[in-house]
């Protein structure tokens, strides 16, 4: 299946000069969505994963069904103020400033093998911050899986040394 056919391209969104890749059409098509999830599940199967971690919000959309299919748990990564219990956090550089991500301090147990799942790999800031939190909690990042990688934005540099699966590539 050619998943690229299920990605909408919106020019100048969310701001002038940005090309947005919208996964909504992929999610709206049961066959395409299921195919994408199965591809990530297949990637994860040999890695002996204990936990899926997904950054908000689209990491939930992709990561939760993967966790369900694997019969394992899911841990969310969120912006400050969105998680009710004790959290750990990481500040990370974005294109125009600094942002913060958080996860529950008890989300990952030492030694757990974790797969990070998100919709998009661009500059790698989000995944790098997520890796930092998982490793701070004693987890082992066994891999990263993305629906889309935007080429030319150096996201791979952020995950250098980590195994990664990307289902589609688009110009960045």
UniProtKB/Swiss-Prot annotation:
The keyword Cytoplasm applies. GO terms for cellular component: cytoplasm. PROSITE patterns: PUR_PYR_PR_TRANSFER. Catalyzes a salvage reaction resulting in the formation of AMP, that is energically less costly than de novo synthesis. Pfam families: Pribosyltran. Belongs to the purine/pyrimidine phosphoribosyltransferase family. It comes from the Bacteria. Its main location: cytoplasm. GO terms for biological process: adenine salvage; AMP salvage; purine ribonucleoside salvage. InterPro entries: Ade_phspho_trans, PRibTrfase_dom, PRTase-like, UPRTase/APRTase. Pathway: Purine metabolism; AMP biosynthesis via salvage pathway; AMP from adenine: step 1/1. It catalyses: AMP + diphosphate = 5-phospho-alpha-D-ribose 1-diphosphate + adenine. Homodimer. Its EC number is 2.4.2.7. This is Adenine phosphoribosyltransferase. SUPFAM superfamilies: PRTase-like. It comes from Streptococcus thermophilus (strain ATCC BAA-250 / LMG 18311).
